[in-house]
Amino acid sequence: QLFATLDTTTRQMWLAEAGRSAVLSDTVGFIRDLPHKLVDAFRATLYEATDADVLLHVVDAASPQAGEQMAEVERVLEEIGAERIPQILVFNKLDLIEPAAQPRVLADAIERAPGVVTPRVFVSAKDGRGLDVLRQHVADRLASRLNGAALPTLSPLPLHDPVHGAA
C-alpha cells in the first residue's frame, strides 16, 4: 500500500529543549492505488506541509518498500512546493528489527537516502528509543529557523480608525 492515513492529526507539544511549544501535524501516510475520489482530499492534506517550519519525514525502517516510499515523498514534496522546507528524516520501528540486524538495516536505510543531507534519526515510537534525540533535532531546527526569521510586527493602529475610515 502506498498511503495509509488520510486524516491529519494536529497537537501542540512543549519542547523543553527549545523553551517553547510547537504545533505538530501528522499528515498523510502511504497507500497504493488511491481511489480517484480521494485524490483531492489527499492533495489538500499534503498542502498543509507547505506552511511547516520543519518537516519530519517518517519512514518505516522495517519496510522493504522504504526506499520507494521515501522517493515518492520527496517527489510529492517537490510537486507541492515544499522541497525547501527543512526536514528531519526519521526512521521509525526499530523495535521491529532484531538487535543483531539493526546495524545492517540502518546502514541500508542510510544508503536508500544517499542524497539526503538532513539529519537522520532512528527511533522506536513504541518503546521510546531515540525520541530524546528526535526532540533535540526538532528543537534545534526550530531555533535556527526562528532565529533567522523576521517576525511580523503589529501596527499600533487599530483595524478601524474612526477619523480616517478603515485602516
Identify what each model region corresponds to.
Residues 1-9, 16-44, 61-64:
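Switch II (G3) loop of P-loop NTPases
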Residues 4, 18, 64-167:
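C-terminal-of-GTPase-core extension/linker across diverse P-loop GTPases
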Residues 15-21, 51, 83:
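Short flexible coil/turn linkers enriched for glycine and charged/polar residues
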Residues 24, 58, 90-93:
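Generic enzyme active-site microenvironment
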Residues 25, 51-55, 114-118:
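Short acidic (Asp/Glu) and glycine-rich catalytic loops that position anionic groups and cofactors
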Residues 37-63, 75-82, 124:
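Inter-motif core of Ras-like GTPase G domains
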